[in-house]
Amino acid sequence: MTRLTLALDVMGGDFGPSVTVPAALQALNSNSQLTLLLVGNPDTITPLLAKADFEQRSRLQIIPAQSVIASDARPSHAIRNSRGTSMRIALELVKEGRAEACVSAGNTGALMGLAKLMLKPIQGIERPALVTVLPHQQKGKTVVLDLGANVDCDSTMLAQFAIMGSVLAEEVVGISNPRVALLNIGEEETKGLDSIREAAELLKSAPSINYIGYLEANELLTGKTDVLVCDGFTGNVTLKTMEGVVRMFLSLLKSQGEGKKTAWWLILLKRWLQKSLTRRFSHLNPDQYNGACLLGLRGTVIKSHGAANQRAFTVAIEQAVQAVQRQVPQRIAARLESVLAKSD
């Protein structure tokens, strides 16, 4: 494995350095070839590195940043006033070639705008999309996009997302001739917004896309499609609803029957069932797949959940490592060139 360097916006997210710095140390423990540039306030970061050993410190560098973009800041205002912020500096490190990817749990709109401004979209792509790969009940994976980068999407953008998602599924996930579906309120062709119906027509006529039609939200984890496409508003709401239900389910499995007087053998049986079911469904835990790639850029940018805990942010760092190792932007660009040529 070759050495690689990532830039972390350690000030972003709901918990900032208290989560991101320990996560960085955890990532270093897991990958001996990893070097991390911690972008943020040195006075805040340095005390959190007290437990880092010499070997870890040799693969860490603090890059000072004057300020942080607030999570509730309007993207347009944040971008105009972004100079000196941890998010912008982390992206600049990627642009300058000092880092191979950026990871941030900060303001999604600002990250999208700054990344597009500084790293530029791949030729043929109008706007990048946030994408993640979710596990489904058939023990396979489904590529889902957009998850919040673009609240409003026209039919052309949805079709471009479908192409990018299809290429990602084939080139990175390893799915041959991936099935592509549009998220909609019904499977009938007359259902949904104009943009969705128009995107469906575009995808039907695209020879390189294996378009299978509409899919409803309750079938997200069924494995009926390999790529699911939607606008950022719908995708974000769908993903967070699913995550909330999964967290509640896993929590109920662990707490079921607590505090009640029950025969000893029933207690043992319940504990066995709880452990068994928790193991069976643990792959659905949102912490296991935190980190959405901002797909369609000339560089690698990973967006972590703002509310990510230490384990979840570590997973986001691991996602960045995998994206760099698999050369996602380069492979997407190469495939898009041929795909878009065939679609013309």
Curated annotation (Swiss-Prot):
Pathway: Lipid metabolism; phospholipid metabolism. It comes from the Bacteria. GO terms for cellular component: cytoplasm. Transmembrane segments: none annotated. One of its GO terms (biological process) is fatty acid biosynthetic process. InterPro entries: FA_synthesis, Phospholipid_synth_PlsX-like. Keywords: Cytoplasm, Lipid biosynthesis, Lipid metabolism, Phospholipid biosynthesis, Phospholipid metabolism, Transferase. Its main location: cytoplasm. It catalyses: a fatty acyl-[ACP] + phosphate = an acyl phosphate + holo-[ACP]. Its EC number is 2.3.1.274. It holds the Pfam family FA_synthesis. GO terms for molecular function: phosphate:acyl-[acyl carrier protein] acyltransferase activity. It is found in: Cytoplasm. NCBIfam families: plsX. Homodimer. Probably interacts with PlsY. Catalyzes the reversible formation of acyl-phosphate (acyl-PO(4)) from acyl-[acyl-carrier-protein] (acyl-ACP). This enzyme utilizes acyl-ACP as fatty acyl donor, but not acyl-CoA. Belongs to the PlsX family. This is Phosphate acyltransferase. It comes from Enterobacter sp. (strain 638).
